[in-house]
């Protein structure tokens, strides 16, 4: 984890702690004492997110299935790569994003709830790649250009579902942990990144979160930090050769998505 990411996570946790203190530090009476006994309730949420990739590069770029299926690409690739075979790319920086959605909460038992929280997340990822290209070929054909930093925006339709385990309520505060899964469809990547790298639009995620419910006079306010771990390799090695990936895009073996979100619920 680089220093920029560490600072971001520290700031996020500080915001989480501050929101909990702001909404839960005063108590005169117990609010909403029967709130958790409702079999079904609704709400909405707002959040801040950051997205990144877990990047796996080919040890030898010519192991990419595209070159196996289309060997006619290899001669130009060798010129472009200056006859080198190994390159690297890494996640570069933190770019903040925004999340919004709704809540459908089903009470299962005293301590367990089933949560359905569909929404939308807007964000971007940025990575840096290290490749010594043949500059004589730069911009000679479509898609062949020199890039060092690459940003890929995303507009996700989020479909998460999970189980929340609630701890003991202490006055107007109640901690919880969340375990779940999510399916996400990216509405943005095809339009923006098709000329850069071929990505799948859909992917599955495992999710874990923790937070604190604050029972106010008229509603329940909740702050939660959640980590979404992408299970799908988003790279499409079988992309249509009629829309070839720029040569620097062939170095990626796997791109897996991570999303870190600070969420504020109003229920």
Which residues does each PLM region occupy?
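Predominantly the C-terminal beta-signal and adjacent terminal strand-loop region
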Residues: 214-267
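Outer-membrane beta-barrel transmembrane domain signature
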Residues: 151-154, 165-222, 228-238
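Extracellular loop and loop/strand-boundary signature of outer-membrane beta-barrel proteins
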Residues: 29-31, 85-90, 144-150, 192-198, ...
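Flexible, surface-exposed loop regions and adjacent strand-edge segments
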Residues: 59-66, 130-140, 193-199, 238-246
């Amino acid at each position: 984890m680089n220093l920029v990411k560490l600072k971001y996570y520290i700031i996020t946790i500080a915001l989480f702690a501050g929101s909990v203190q702001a909404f839960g530090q005063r108590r005169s009476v117990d609010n909403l004492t029967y709130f958790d006994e409702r079999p079904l309730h609704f709400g909405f949420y707002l959040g801040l997110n950051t997205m990144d990739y877990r990047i796996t590069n080919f040890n030898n770029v010519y192991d990419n299935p595209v070159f196996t299926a289309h060997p006619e690409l290899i001669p130009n690739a060798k010129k472009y790569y200056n006859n080198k075979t190994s390159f690297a790319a890494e996640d570069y920086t933190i770019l903040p994003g925004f999340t919004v959605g709704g809540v459908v909460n089903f009470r299962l038992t005293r301590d367990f709830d089933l949560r359905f929280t569909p929404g939308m997340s807007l964000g971007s990822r940025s990575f840096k790649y290290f490749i010594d290209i043949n500059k004589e070929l730069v911009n000679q054909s479509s898609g062949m250009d020199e890039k060092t930093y690459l940003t890929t925006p995303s507009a996700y339709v989020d479909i998460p579902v999970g189980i929340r385990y609630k701890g003991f309520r202490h006055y107007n505060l109640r901690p919880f942990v969340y375990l779940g899964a999510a399916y996400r469809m990216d509405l943005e990547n095809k339009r923006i990144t098709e000329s850069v790298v071929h990505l799948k639009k859909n992917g599955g995620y495992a999710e874990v979160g923790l937070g604190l419910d604050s029972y106010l006079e008229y509603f329940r306010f909740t702050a939660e930090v959640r980590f979404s771990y992408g299970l799908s390799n988003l790279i499409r090695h079988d992309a249509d050769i009629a829309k070839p990936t720029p040569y620097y895009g062939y170095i990626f073996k796997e791109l897996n998505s991570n999303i870190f979100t600070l969420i504020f619920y109003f229920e």
